[in-house]
């Protein structure tokens, strides 16, 4: 189970349920530092880890989110939205949309969707419409560098080279 606040992140645009549990499973500070090796590397590594580890239930507590230069210098946002799903990727994809971001902003989720052959049409939202609860979270000041996650051309050989 992964329970986390909706928040922006200094390397991967947002931290939601999947990243919360993936990084939380790493043993120590050194292991966590190893995956933070630039935008391309961290997004490929998180997608690779997501093939092996993932919560059975994700709860995104957005009653009060965190925006801006999180995790060190972020500030609260009163978003008053809570999301839950038994499908970890679906929860995060809807969560990032509620925060005002698109799937192509968050590499590890985009890769995870492609690996599982999922599309946005495969995700059913029950309850409020995204448009009715969406609140734009202020991104990290360095968001331009975070959006360089995409590997040119076919990313799968690079993905396959990432150690399990």
Regions found by a protein language model. Name each.
Residues 2-164:
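Extended, low-polarity segments enriched in aliphatic/aromatic residues
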């Amino acid at each position: 189970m992964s329970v986390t606040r909706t928040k922006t992140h200094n390397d991967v645009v947002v931290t939601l349920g999947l990243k919360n549990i993936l990084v939380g499973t790493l043993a120590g500070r050194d292991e966590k530092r190893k995956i933070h090796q630039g935008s391309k590397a961290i997004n490929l590594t998180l997608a690779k880890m997501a093939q092996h580890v993932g919560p059975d239930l994700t709860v995104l507590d957005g009653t009060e989110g965190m925006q801006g230069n999180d995790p060190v210098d972020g500030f609260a946002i009163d978003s008053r939205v809570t999301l839950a799903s038994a499908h970890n990727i679906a929860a995060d994809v809807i969560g990032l949309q509620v925060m005002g971001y698109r799937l192509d902003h968050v590499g590890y989720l985009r890769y995870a969707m492609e690996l599982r052959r999922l599309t946005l049409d495969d995700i059913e939202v029950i309850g409020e419409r995204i448009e009715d609860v969406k609140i734009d979270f202020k991104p990290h000041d360095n968001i331009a560098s975070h959006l360089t996650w995409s590997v040119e051309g076919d990313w799968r050989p690079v993905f396959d080279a990432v150690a399990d």
